[in-house]
Amino acid sequence: SEKYGIKGAMVSAVDLTKGLGIYIGMEILNVPGVTGYLDTNYVGKAEYSLEALERVDLVYIHVEAPDEASHAGNYKDKIKAIEDFDALVVGTVLRGIKAFEDYRVLVMPDHPTPIEVRTHTDEPVPFVIYDSREKKNNKGAVFSEEILNAEGVVKIQHGHELMDYFIRG
């Protein structure tokens, strides 16, 4: 909050992540049923986050289920976790956030955890940012490694630089 002059909140089932949020002055949203696994309360995370945006400028929603499925080496659970995250968190947020005048949404994993190795790796992390003020129409756009490596795609060299890019544009 000091660096950017904004207030933030976060929701996570992971104590380490919540501790980091507390350390930087974020409000911790205590959502019932948040587990860090496939049975987590995805919709609750999104709804509590949207409600928090009435009083804070930024909400960080951490979802652990895809990472846990990767550590277990379970590709079916990882697919389910990503699909649930997309439909129940991202979908809920994108529908609800339209009530706000201007907004930006950043979606990304916190780190890669390939199923093949069952641990975190240091590959680049893909991200997508939606800015309601931009009038580009990318409806139906798809993701591929080829697109990710294309000329003109924003690449952030160091992870700590992403927040500057997201906040300041």
Give names to the regions the model predicted:
Residues 1-169:
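Feature captures the catalytic ectodomains and active-site-proximal regions of enzymes
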